[in-house]
Design a protein with these regions (language model features):
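NAD(P)+-binding Rossmann beta1-loop-alpha1 motif at the extreme N-terminus of oxidoreductases
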Residues: 1-64
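Rossmann-like NAD(P)(H) cofactor-binding subdomain of soluble oxidoreductases
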Residues: 80-132
């Protein structure tokens, strides 16, 4: 298996997916893109964020397309990640490597997927959408890799090399259980508190703008993050 990544497909052209695309293109990697929104595809092509578009998941599952790319990155909200990975079942256990960007992992349960490595690039913004794409978003940031499916030799190394070389990230690895517990404390809980605090202030009907300190402004910034993504994270990384 060739561990070099020269051509990739990104599924999901929001802020994360588009930022990966820009960083990859800056390293000479050819980028294919797919998104359920035709407007996002159009904008990505117009802004030269991607090189070529893919029309459908059916096209991605074809044997001919698998030969065109070295790596597929699923960059959609967490709840959709499992659905998309299952939609790609026809290309499980092939030489093309598949990874994701979800910040919660415990719900991703797949049987017989030896070419899937889970990734969590720890970088983000309170902005969202393709208009927030930033090719330097991931530079010098950390990426946590999980290999819960006992991947075939070479796939982990390929993903690890991609994040390090193309996006200039630092990588580490841990189990899914450890990952979700750590990020529940260091990321998910702070965001949950920020949403609760800002909502409480809104419901109080008090004008606090003139008395807002730096701490509140940081909570305001966190609460401005993509609400769909964070709803998924809170629902998926919880203990009933």
């Amino acid at each position: 298996m060739n561990l070099n990544v020269e051509k990739i497909l990104i599924i999901g052209l929001g802020m994360i997916g588009s930022s990966i695309a820009l960083a990859s293109k800056s390293k000479g990697i050819k980028v294919y893109g797919f998104d359920k929104s035709n407007n996002s595809i159009k904008e990505a092509l117009e802004k030269n964020i991607i090189d070529s578009k893919v029309e459908s998941i059916l096209d991605i599952n074809s044997k001919d397309f698998v030969k065109k790319v070295d790596l597929i990155i699923v960059a959609v909200p967490p709840k959709q990640t499992l659905d998309v990975l299952n939609d790609l079942k026809d290309i499980w256990n092939t030489d093309v490597t598949i990874t994701d960007t979800s910040s919660v992992k415990n719900h991703i349960k797949l049987n017989g997927a030896s070419n899937i490595i889970l990734s969590h690039p720890i970088a983000g913004s309170d902005q969202s959408g393709i208009s927030a794409a930033n090719g330097d978003l991931f530079k010098n940031k950390k990426n946590v890799l999980c290999d819960p499916f006992n991947s075939k030799k070479g796939h982990f190394e390929k993903v690890d090399n991609f994040w390090k070389n193309a996006l200039q990230m630092r990588t580490s690895s841990m189990s899914v259980t450890e990952h979700d517990l750590i990020f529940a404390m260091t990321s998910h809980l702070p965001h949950l508190v920020s949403y609760a605090l800002i909502d409480s202030i809104r419901l109080s009907n008090h004008d606090v703008d003139d008395n807002a300190g730096g701490g509140l402004k940081e909570f305001l910034r966190l609460s401005g993050s993509n609400s769909e993504m964070w709803r998924d994270i809170f629902m998926l990384n919880r203990v009933d």
